[in-house]
Regions:
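N-terminal small-residue-enriched
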Residues: 2-544
Length: 544
């Protein structure tokens, strides 16, 4: 489920009711605290490993997972819903006869887990009868007993519910006082407590935290019935509740005064600004279609990176293994061998699972592989993909990239997108200096609607805020802006990237993939970047 789909459900008033069935059983807030004892989890894991080995499996991994989520949903002066969910169980994956088998159980006893392991073994043996080539697992060292935790300062689950609700209602009141007609604000809080064990000799305990604080402001012209919205400029993050402290050092002010945010977010300040900007959008002139140089803020660029780089460079899409859910990829294996020109020489795109504050940042993936950072595009040329253990041999790698993930103990892990990011420019360059060189352009802030084809080649992107640039100066707000692109042509048009001081993360809290669908969270970083000669359309115009 994509984050925009989730917000749409909230707007219809049905999202809250759907939450428990999607994420687990509804529980009291107090049940979101604490964790299973590590020794208990190890006993369960050993029971599964021993049963799988006794059943003739050549490999087994076990994931003991406790998934905790809290959603607080408000509209104007009202709390519409508070949902706490908890889901705990064990997922067991085995190799037998060169084929995979998987089974899961929520019976947290050694006997229950051993039974599930034997079921997984039986499934693998049945699958092996139709397996055309055996699974080849890239080796990974046994790590012994290790642990990793998101480096948070405040555990969101330990913050009193009243404090969270009061924050949202205070944000809403400030936006309404500033001229908003309607305000929706939410808190999505996640804690994944994951224990991994395998016959390789790893026992990995991880405590992963994520937070997202979206809001939507609506302004209405009562004389005409026209309305405009402005979504919040927060980013979902791999942080604790300290993200909402509003640290002033993490504010990024654009040349025209729009405030963006880095590793800390002032939700109230953003809501007040959004109310003013949503009202300003009501009278903003509509864009004239044509070719423009685009200056794209990181709050916008993350989505373009996600769709035009992150997804097409997932190896399962490249190979055609993943097709039904949002397509395959134009970036086929022959293009990697030929060092295909994915973008201009300024473009360096990396994948990583270790970025501080990122949604995808963990110590180890769901195959027990220690995470890392690696190149996808270097100096504009395609050099690599995102791979997991049973894919590595296909591209000649000796090890996995460490980007395997399952969204639940009851789901089998598979290849998921790492944090894919555009590296900052190497030369000192501010946003103001970048804009000074633009004769005819548009400055875009925030993400909006988008569309992309099944090969991740042709796409269209909107945004939240659009500003005309004429002769090196921001002149006025525009409306009804979207740009069209072909992936390699768009990235070839990248002519400037601001330096590291402007670098920020954006991301998707609910990124869907697979059938049955699984949701993951992933960040994408960049500094403000310029793209020349991009086709802009007017979304308010109709054909005919």
């Amino acid at each position: 489920m994509h984050r925009r789909d989730f917000i749409a459900l909230m707007g219809l008033g049905i999202g809250g009711a759907a939450v428990p069935s999607i994420f687990g059983k509804a529980v009291a807030a107090e049940q979101l605290l604490g964790a299973l004892d590590v020794a208990f989890k190890k006993r369960l894991a050993d029971a599964a490993l021993n049963a799988a080995t006794a059943a003739g499996c050549s490999y087994c991994d076990v994931r003991v997972g406790r998934y905790l989520r809290q959603f607080i949903i408000t509209r104007d002066a009202h709390i519409e819903n508070v949902v706490n969910t908890e889901s705990t169980g064990v997922g067991i994956r085995v190799l037998a006869g060169g084929a995979w088998g998987f089974a899961a159980t929520n019976e947290l006893t050694p006997e229950g887990v051993a039974t599930a392991a034997r079921q997984a073994a039986a499934i693998a043996k049945a699958n092996s009868k139709s397996q055309t080539s055996p699974v080849q697992l890239a080796p990974t060292p046994g790590l012994g007993e290790v642990s990793w935790k998101t480096p948070i300062k405040k555990n969101s689950m330990e913050v009193p519910l009243k404090e969270k609700a009061d924050l949202l209602l205070d944000v809403n009141a400030a936006a309404l006082a500033a001229g908003a007609n309607f305000v929706n604000s939410l808190l999505f809080l996640v804690n994944e407590q994951k224990y991994f064990a395998s016959t390789d000799g790893s026992y990995i305990d991880q405590d992963v935290h994520r937070i997202w604080a979206p809001l939507t402001i609506t302004a209405i012209d009562k004389a005409t019935g026209k309305f405009r919205t402005r979504d919040g400029l927060s980013a979902p993050m791999g942080l604790g509740f300290e993200y909402l402290d509003g640290d002033k050092s993490q504010k990024f002010v654009s040349p025209n005064g729009v405030v963006n945010y880095g590793m800390s977010y002032d939700m109230k300040e953003d809501a007040v600004a959004a109310a003013r900007q949503a009202r300003e959008k009501l009278s903003a002139p509509s864009v004239k279609p044509g070719k423009y140089d685009l200056v794209l803020d990181p709050s916008h660029t993350w989505l373009t990176i996600h769709e035009s780089v992150g997804h097409p460079l997932e190896l399962d899409r490249v190979l055609g293994y993943e097709a039904n859910y949002a397509g395959t990829s134009f970036a086929t294996m022959d293009k990697r061998e030929a060092r295909f020109q994915y973008g201009s020489p300024l473009v360096n795109l990396t994948a990583d699972k270790v970025a501080p504050g990122s949604l995808g940042g963990v110590g180890y993936d769901d195959e027990g592989v220690k995470t890392k950072k690696w190149d996808l595009v270097r100096d504009g040329k395609l050099v690599d993909y995102q791979t997991i253990r049973d894919q590595a041999h296909i591209v000649g790698k000796k090890e996995s990239d460490g980007c395997c993930y399952a969204d639940s103990w009851s789901s089998v892990q598979f290849q998921r997108m790492a944090n894919v990011s555009l590296e900052a420019g190497k030369s000192k360059l501010s946003v103001a200096d970048m804009i000074k060189d633009v004769e005819n352009g548009i400055y875009i802030i925030g993400d909006g609607s988008f569309s992309i084809d099944q090969q991740r080649y042709n796409a269209q992107f909107g945004g939240q805020l659009f500003y005309e640039i004429k002769q090196g100066k921001i002149t006025r707000m525009l409306e009804d802006v979207a740009y069209q692109m072909r992936t390699p042509e768009f990235w070839a048009g990248c002519t400037a990237i601001c330096d590291q001081s402007d670098y920020r993360l954006g991301g998707s809290f609910f990124d869907g993939k697979g059938q049955p669908s699984q949701s993951s969270a992933v960040s994408h970083g960049s500094s403000t970047a310029r793209f020349n000669g991009i086709n802009v359309i007017n979304t308010a115009r109709s054909l005919g």
